[in-house]
């Protein structure tokens, strides 16, 4: 999705340099200087500027339809939030949320806004290509997003808010009979009007998130273009909300037939929250509300020592101690020297290193803005200053400007731009830190300080508007970066009470490298194991010389945490069959249809996992089988029917070689070890394997059959391991249930260093269609919710489920290692994708529970899209060549597991489409191994029996 930003003029020229965002994805411009276009005219101007910059030979209609776009209006003067007026409110730095993982110390309002908008636009039907939003709000939702109707020309999101809040905003009115269709839009209606509506109407409060079809965009542009074509005529002022919005609906308040003809859907953002960052007060109140959204101590990942929760410090050098009397303090990109005194309602931004003696009374704020190469604008202001109105009538520094001027001996009439405080030239420009402190003292609290009066009098002075227009934003950001780099070692050192290890450690490691910061001191062994593992992976990312050893340490600690409980309980295998009996274990394989990867440690240990999968037989049989039988000699014989290999084990050392590269029997060796046939896993002690087997009563012959090619994506290795463990459990009387077998499979995979999650083994150990869920923590015991199997077994549906072996193989280990690495690092984008996948599994659960075949099929397609976002190699060209042949015939398809090859699972639109898919792929086989395999739902899961 392309992002089109309307920004303050001074920010446009350096936006990409200071944000490091790619210019080909982020386009920015400003409204014409000195012209007020309104939100509608501004939208037209922004679209026209973007079209001129990138259209090539496309017509405007072609360009508009060629991509999805986010239009973000952030070009205001920021009168009521002076601290971030120069860089634009949209780039306001916001602290890491104390309850959130994967955020960055350098995050901004913009970086927090965009992910939700991306999610919404990913759901938008074809033709709804343009989203228009405001730049000074943060919106989040705790519930699934509602589906977007395909019939709408305009989709508007709203919240259910009370009349005391709604009266200050636009509201969408609908009838109770058609609650998603707009009747009319009202701007700032009275409480009485809203009360009268509720008897037979609903109303939603506008949150400024609109999606427009190409048709609606052109209607909006035509109304803000006075003559000629919408890409060429003069742009005029037009309000998208007060004029365009009020002309929408079945009974609009403004008559305009062309606008009223547009079909409008209004959608409640269920579980939505709306936080405004438009004023100094809102900067603190909104952030405090966000930080306090979660008070459950189990959800809060660090425990700070602030004396009050409304104290926010970022990118700063603080040399004072906070006290209980401090409230509503915002310090960012600033140095607070040891001789400063702060009280409450203070915002301090941009202040360079200093040793001033300075007191800020309640409500006094300071903003220092770099000008040119070596000067600064000194801007004190009041917490509630609105910067609007003539100097004779306006408030400044918490009092009237007139009284401030009188106290400081300044004649209002002598001030240039006195018609409006925003235009008044009252802020002095200085070229050294000492003068900066002196003139601040004079302006804030020492009107009799002659030196300060003299400096103010002789200085060049700027207005608030001029400061924004002339600010050197590169210097401003450079100072911020310097302070942040200075903070990092302290934040790391104070890790138990800071956000360090809940941050995006990939981002943090980059900051350590870029600023050549020494790594933190080694973490104590008493620290939580998972934190130590994340610390090791952070060090691997931050350093080049020891990257591999730190990575190995991280995986080793993960392995220790996952295996500790199982290894703490040793086993005492005892022969539980007759001398001529054979134990036969057999298992289906699994197809993950939603939520795969969320079961993978360490993600599932941090946040839990949700997976919907199905257990299937191939060609009518469980494809994974293990036979265990006694043998007279005191040794262990391992055989593989499909590989035609065998190995005889006579010593503990030979059995302990389950990690030997290239061994076809790594899985059964590790399974035998976990069953108690290695000393470290056995309750009793024996000098040799031979002596243990003699005491056991016989040797063992273990025969494996995997009737599936390697790299199938069907969970083969995990389920083969659980099949072997299940058969040994019965043969040796170990007393494990399916949950124990699943856990020990996870341990086995850790012993083999292949890693992996829990959904593979539980997907086949347990029958049918099910949702598997775990909570955070090392005890990953899935809760199982079985689903109706009608969509898989009823004849007309069953024929639509197709399984095709592509003949392309790809092992999952290297894919897994890189994705797991990013899990350790709390990498923001991947974490967001995993959370989306986790919710997606619940959507799939709902679709199957409702027996909605079409929705289920489409959701499988969404699963495939998610997998590709997580790992681009999931869908190589060879696979794309296959799917391109049948794309239009499927509701959805995916490669099970890690992808890249193996089997292709398809859900055809209907039986006729299924027949056509079979014909097409049989006629266009990509290789001599490619073939259809008959799949059927397994209703029994893992089975074990005796001869």
Indicate where each model-derived feature is located.
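Short beta-strand segments
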Residues: 71-74, 132-134, 157-160, 213, ...
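Stable alpha-helical structural segments in soluble proteins, enriched in small hydrophobic residues
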Residues: 46, 553-561, 671, 719-731
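DPxDG-like acidic metal-binding loop motif
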Residues: 87, 91, 712-734, 905
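N-terminal glycine-rich phosphate-binding loop and ensuing alpha1 helix
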Residues: 1-129, 133, 138-146, 404
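Left-handed beta-helix
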Residues: 2-7, 28, 35-36, 42-58, ...
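Conserved core of the sugar-phosphate nucleotidyltransferase
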Residues: 65-66, 85-88, 92-229, 268
